[in-house]
C-alpha cells in the first residue's frame, strides 16, 4: 500500500528538482553535512525533516546531492524509494561503514558490494522478490571500479550481508550458508538494491571497514565522520562520471 505519491513527502521537504540525478547516501546525516560542507561548492540544504539532512551542490562543476539514509533496511527503504520514485533520482551510491566478516579484510579497507545478502523480508513485501541476494548495478560498479584505478585506494569487491539486527543475544546457531562469501556486515544495501530493482533505477554500495570483532578494533563516532575521505572522494569522482 502506498501512502504518498509525490514530492515533497512527509519525510522530505525538498521540492521537485532539488536533487541531482546522482545522490550519495551515508547513514549518518551529520556525515552528509560534513561531506557537503567539505567537498561541495555552493552546497544548499534541501531537507531537514526528522534531522535527515540533505544537500545539493557542485563537485568539480557537476551537480551532486548528498543525503543521510538513517540506520537499517526500513530507513534506507523509505528515503531511497522516495528519491527514486518522487524526485527523479537515477543513481544512488550508499557510502557507509561496515564490520569485517572475513579474516582477509582489514580496518579501513574500502569494499564495493557486488551483491547484498539478507534474511530480511523487505524485498518480498515491497515487490514480491523472494530471494535472499540482490545485485548492485553493474553499470555503477564498473564506473566506480574504473575510477578507483586513478587513485591510491585499494578497492575490494565482493559480497556484503545486510542485517536487520545490530544487538543480538549470543546463541548457538548455524550461520547462513552465504556467510562464507561475505566480506563485510552492514545494514542498508539490501533495501537500496531492492528499490533500484523494483523501480528500474541504479544503486551501488561502498563501505569502509570501521569495526573488526575478531581484533576488537573500532573507530570512534568522530573518526567515522571525518576519516573516510578516500571513500568519499572515490564516490564523488565516480558520481560526476554517471
Mark where each language-model region is.
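Active-site rim beta-loop-alpha module in soluble metabolic enzymes
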Residues: 130-179
Amino acid at each position: 500500500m502506498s501512502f504518498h505519491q509525490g514530492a515533497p513527502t512527509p519525510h522530505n521537504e525538498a521540492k521537485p528538482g532539488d536533487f541531482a540525478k546522482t545522490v550519495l547516501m551515508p547513514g549518518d546525516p551529520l556525515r552528509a553535512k560534513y561531506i557537503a560542507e567539505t567537498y561541495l561548492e555552493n552546497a544548499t540544504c534541501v531537507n531537514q525533516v526528522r534531522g535527515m539532512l540533505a544537500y545539493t551542490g557542485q563537485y568539480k562543476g557537476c551537480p551532486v546531492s548528498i543525503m543521510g539514509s538513517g540506520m537499517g533496511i526500513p530507513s534506507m527503504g523509505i528515503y531511497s524509494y522516495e528519491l527514486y520514485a518522487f524526485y527523479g533520482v537515477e543513481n544512488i551510491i550508499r557510502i557507509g561503514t561496515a564490520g569485517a566478516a572475513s579474516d582477509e579484510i582489514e580496518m579501513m579497507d574500502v569494499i564495493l558490494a557486488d551483491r547484498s545478502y539478507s534474511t530480511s523480508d523487505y524485498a518480498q513485501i515491497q515487490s514480491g522478490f523472494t530471494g535472499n541476494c540482490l545485485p548492485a548495478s553493474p553499470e555503477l560498479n564498473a564506473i566506480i571500479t574504473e575510477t578507483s584505478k586513478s587513485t591510491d585506494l585499494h578497492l575490494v569487491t565482493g559480497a556484503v550481508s545486510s542485517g536487520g539486527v545490530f544487538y543480538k543475544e549470543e546463541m548457538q546457531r548455524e550461520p547462513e550458508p552465504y556467510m562464507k562469501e561475505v566480506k563485510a556486515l552492514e545494514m542498508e544495501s539490501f533495501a537500496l538494491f531492492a528499490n533500484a530493482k523494483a523501480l528500474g533505477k541504479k544503486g551501488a554500495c561502498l563501505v569502509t571497514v570501521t569495526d573488526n570483532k575478531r581484533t576488537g578494533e573500532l573507530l570512534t563516532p568522530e573518526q567515522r565522520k571525518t576519516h573516510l575521505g578516500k571513500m568519499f572522494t572515490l564516490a564523488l569522482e565516480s558520481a560526476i562520471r554517471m
